[in-house]
Amino acid sequence: MSPTRREFLGTLGGLAAGYALAPALRAAESSGKPLGLALCGLGNYSNGELSPALLETKNVKLVAVITGTREKGVKLAKLHGFDEANIYSYEEWDKVAANKAIDIVYVVTPPGIHAQNVLAAFGAGKHVICEKPMAISAAECDTMIAAGKKAGKRLAIGYRLHFDPYHQELVRLAKTQEFGPFMKIKSANGYTLRRKSWRIEKKLAGGGALTDMGIYSIQGVCMAADANPISVTAKELPKTQPELFVEVEQALEFRLEFANGAVADVWSGYDANRAEIFAEAAKGWFKGERPVFSYRGLNISTSAKGKLDFGIFRQQQRHMDGVAQAFRNGTEVTCTGEVGRRDMVIIDGIYESIRTGKRVELKYS
């Protein structure tokens, strides 16, 4: 079982003091060798996407796992060739700290326990990659960012699409304004969820479709606008399965407004299979259709180039290699903890708008 948040907060200071400045770790980072990574949480994403990608990465390799199910760790140890002694429980952060082969901990647990896992990893003197959403509130994000700074370690979020060439084309178009600024943006992302899972438990998921699927649209919209929204107006949609979605929303709609007058209308839900984004400017457009936010086979086109084709690759490999290289070289990445926090400010604002029925101004400081 995972330790409680109170237990982690109580021990963070001592762990950070003991391990944040380990000389051997600094030497490993500067050597040019692949950094060692430990997966924290061995669910479907770790086993189905991250593990295969780590067989292809050049800048980082899997050297350990942190899991509540040792059998899962044994399988990955055999596949990736690391010692079974490097399979740790969630209570063995002292051993993680002592393992000099581990440079990065990739937190892939449910969002409700991201903060406690990230705090523990920083306390163990490791860099951190944290899956999305970064946390279940902007306040938790602040705690995580502060812990990383105290430990002198880097934090990145698992925003794989920052390293995806299709979405990088959207970023390029927005920054160069080749078509002019994108003033009208629409996006939708969701799927049909019919059975119970941790994703509909508020304590673990933080929210419903918004924190799981809507966050992709938030990312895409901010890429297209090349800015952070200044306000949001949102409403929850009627539930078609109220007996299932007791604690969280099933579907919602929201509008984001930007300082230059651009607007983005977004839908997110667990009651339909949708994935799309459309950004329109005076001289052209960018369009992504299902699957636009998926792991592979993206269907994206622009008014200038038609359908884009960047070949076959693993997004997760590009993401982890890119982040590891930045950690090793001391260079910047776009998927920072601050960006993860920005998205949680927006999500907090969406839920506030639903509660109050009012337009909410978004404040990032």
Task: Annotate the PLM regions.
Residues K33-P34, Y45-S46, L161-F245, G357:
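Predominantly a Rossmann-like dinucleotide-binding segment in NAD(P)-dependent oxidoreductases
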Residues D212, I218-S294, R318-T331:
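Contiguous beta-strand/loop segments that form the cofactor/metal-binding neighborhood of enzyme cores
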Residues K153-R154, G180-K184, E352-S365:
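C-terminal capping/lid region of NAD(P)-dependent oxidoreductase domains
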Residues L12-H80:
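N-terminal Rossmann-like dinucleotide-binding module
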Residues T143-R160, M183:
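Rossmann-fold dehydrogenase core element
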Residues N86-A147:
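Beta-loop-alpha module in the N-terminal Rossmann-like domain of NAD(P)-dependent dehydrogenases
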Residues M1-A16:
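N-terminal secretory signal peptides and thylakoid transit peptides that target proteins
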Residues R160, A275-V345, I354, K358-S365:
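C-terminal glycine/acidic-rich active-site capping loop/insertion
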